[in-house]
C-alpha cells in the first residue's frame, strides 16, 4: 500500500486534504477548491487520489508530522514556475522532516516541461535547504519522463477526460450512415504554429468540408501582420511558405461552427455529438508541436476526444504521437492512410507530411469516405473500448514504480 502525507487533513474518511503548499485562501474548502490552480503558487488538491478511489486502489493519508516511513509528501503543481522555491515555502516543522528524510517529496504535474530541466531546478532548491535530492520524485505528462531518475510518466488527461465524459454521460458510437462533413478540425486557442497549420488547411479547402474553428485571437492588440510567423524563434513552422495563406486566413478568423463560450469549449464535460457522428475524420491540432526541445510525446484531451467517440484521426503534434498511442495499447490507421509523418523529427516537415495526408483524404468524395468508414470500424471501436476501460493497471504500475524507487 502507498502512503501519502499532508500538512492539513480536512476529512480522513473522504481523503479530503488542503493542498500541500497551496495558496492561503479564505472561505470554506469546497467553495475555494477551484481557485488553487489559478492562485500562486498554483498547488492543487491531489486529484491522483481521486483516481485511486475510483479504481478501488488502497492508499492511506497521514499528517506530515506523523507519517509512516516512505510516505510521499504530495505536491500537485498546476504550473511549474522555475522561480518558485517549493522547499522554502514549507513550514519549519515540515522542512525539518524533509531534511530528516521522514518522507519523500512527490510532485504531480500534468504538463510536458523538459524533465531534466525540472529536475535541475528542484535539485538546486533542495541543495539550498539541505534536502537530499534523492528524496524528490516527480510524475509528469511527458512521455519521456522515465528517462530521468525518480521521474515517472502518467497521462493524466486519459483518466481526467474519461471521467468527465462519463459524468456528462457523453458517448458517440460508430455508425454506417452517411455524414455531411469530411472533417472536424477545432482550434480553441491561437498559437503561431497553429495559425500556420490552419492557414494551410484553409488553402487546400479543408474548412469547406468541415466542422472547423479558429478562436481566441484578437486583432485589437495590433496582431494583424505576419512578422510573428516568419521568425523561427517564434514559430517552429516558419520554414513553411505560408505568408500569403496567412493573409487570406486572417480575413476570416475567428470563426466557429457553434456558439459556445470559451469556458464551455474548455470544459471536459462538454460534448457536441455532430462533431463525431457527422464528420468522418478528426484533424487534431495538439497542445504542443515540440515538447520543450525533447523527443517526448504529449497527448491531451484533443486526441482523446475522437478516440472516445469512435472517430479516426490525423494528429498534428509532437513527434511520435501515434507511436506513443500504440505503446499505450491503441491502434492507429497506417495502411488506410500514410502515417509515416509521425516519425519525422523535423517539425515543419512532419506538418507538411500530415497536411499531405489530409489533402489526400480531402480529394475523396463523401461516398468514398463512407467506404473507408467501414475499414476503420474495428480500429475505432477497439480504441473507444480501451479508452473507456478501467485504468487500474496504469495506476498500479505507477504505484509499483514509486514504491520500488530509492
Give a label for each model feature.
Residues 2-284, 290-300, 307-406:
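Pol beta-like nucleotidyltransferase catalytic core
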